Amino acid sequence: VDEPIPVTRTVDHGTAKLMPDVDRERAWLLTVDAAPQSYVDLDEPTHLEFEYARRLGHVLDTVVEPGRPLDVLHLGGGALTLPRYVAATRPGSRQDVVEVDLGLLDLVREHLPVPEDAGITLHGADARGWLESAAPASADIVIADVFGGARVPAHLTSTAYARAAARVLREDGVYLANLADAAPFAFLRSQLATFATVFEELSLIAEPGVLRGRRFGNAVLVASHRPLDTAVLARRTAADAFPARVESGAALREFIGSAAPVRDEDAVPSPEPPGGAFSIG
């Protein structure tokens, strides 16, 4: 059998590279400008390699009863790791993936195709523009994993954006976002304050070392109108190979502190990761 070889291509927003994993036969790492974007195992779509993807997976597994199909809107495509995961764990789900980088979409379609019958539809569009024109109450889950380079774009951080996401969700729907920050957490705290203006229930999933300010890292924001079973989620995330905590309620309000919600005119991207925090090959 031919050894898989790396693929490098200039896409709309940088240089994308697909690198085969030497340890797993049909698994690939996608980087854009050396920042890891996605890891996907074509033979085992339920395998989630990255810490933040595993945490998003735990939420997806616990938010409604296992196996029930969901309508999911993914903002940010990457190599479609989470759409493949949902298709495998919740067959019959209808999923839309919105990715602004058309070149990246083409690369993934060509080298890491999704089965025709997986119920996954790809759209080349800006995430916020798509949200603002989408049908109201059309999604059970919205997952935002959008990084321009290694930063969350400013226009996806404001109260207007949070309202747009809430409008697309059904009443019992759940919004999830992959964010990144370091102490003193100005960005993360402002994001929590922003989503608190729209959603009654908030949780944050992060590694204790990140929350204690030891290093830069990812945090998953979970927002909904209905209370979620954070105890089940906390057990799942604590038992993971990369243990994490679930903060909610009073502890989370204390973490938010005096942070103010973000208005469109004041919005800034998430902070630049320190050199080497996310870079690879």
Regions found by a protein language model. Name each.
Residues P153, L179-T194:
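Conserved class I S-adenosyl-L-methionine
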Residues V1-P20, Q37-D43, T62, R212-G281:
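SAM/dcSAM-binding transferase cores
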Residues L179-A183, F199, P208, R212-F216, ...:
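Charged, long alpha-helical assembly modules
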Residues D172-L179:
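Conserved beta-strand signature within the Rossmann-like core of class I S-adenosyl-L-methionine
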Residues G92-R94, D117-G119, D172, F199-E201, ...:
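A generic structural signal for alpha->beta connector loops
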Residues R9, R24, D43-R167, L211-R214:
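The AdoMet/dcAdoMet-binding core of the Class I SAM-like
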Residues A162-R163, F187-P208:
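Conserved Class I S-adenosyl-L-methionine
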Residues R24-V40:
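A short, structured beta-strand/loop element
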